[in-house]
Amino acid sequence: MSNNIQQLQEELAKLVARNADFEGTQTTKIPSLSISCHTKPHYSNGIIEPYKISKPSIYIVVQGIKEVTVGEEHFGYGSPYYMVASMDLPIIAEVHEASRLKPNLSIKLEFAHSSILELLSGDELMMKVKKKSQRSLNVAKLDESMLDALARLVRLLDKPKDIPILSQIYTKEILYKVLHGEHGEALRQIVTDGSPAVYIQKAVQYIVEHYKDAFSVELIADVAKMSVPSLYRHFKEITAMSPIQFQKQLRLQEARRLLIDEPLDVGEVASRVGYESPTQFIREYSRMFGFSPRKDVKRIKGLDQV
């Protein structure tokens, strides 16, 4: 890592720490920018449903490492890498190591679909439909130019009068670099006419809105206006899951949130998220999180009291 990259990384960590008013994730004066500060181990269990990625975004850990699980895939990322996310995904993001002396600090920057289209308009090569869909969640290496643009954006938190104009300029610059970067195709494909990702987005949106309900894969294929084989192939390529696995992840992560945040018993939670059988719910919950519902809640609440 070059000295300049390390200096920018350290500056970003100081900026995030200084502007973090409380533990956890918070919005900032820049509408598209949010920051996170964790001084203790953290599991996806907040009231704001942290398992949903609602807009195309990038995530940068400026101090520490975050562990991410999507489907059956698991990876960690930190400096000098960033994560690119293009659509709603049921993910688990965890911080295993953090302290008051060295908190885990991160940045999230969201992009509007219209901004992606604006930067791609007129570029026929960039808008060309690719035969193979790209995964909607990827990790890419940060270079000095992107870190510099991020630092300029985050510095605006100390200069609120400059935010209305300069934040838009810097955000567009960062988006341009992402689009032309290693995994820019993940964002390009969601706004490209005829791209399978455009149709998969419709399927994803339907499942997110109806995950508590029973549905057939044929219905999801009809929503996406795709054949069943095509839906299966592209859904798996983009989300790392089948439609039914995607639904199951949403159900179980919402169940985890309910168990932690509300005084409900396991049977009631199972019913709330769409399970008819509490036994099946407990079995699938244990398989996904590694603990039974009760043990998992006790473990997480114990961590919160550290």
Show the residue positions of the predicted features.
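A short, N-terminal "cap"/entry segment at the start of jelly-roll beta-barrel domains
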Residues: 1-31, 47-48, 132-134
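N-terminal regulatory/effector-sensing and dimerization cores
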Residues: 27-128
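Hydrophobic/aromatic-rich alpha-helical bundle segments in the mid-to-C-terminal region
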Residues: 50, 158-164, 186-190
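Aromatic/histidine-rich interaction motifs
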Residues: 121-148
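Basic/polar phosphate-binding segments, predominantly the helix-turn-helix DNA-binding elements
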Residues: 173, 177-183, 192, 208-210, ...
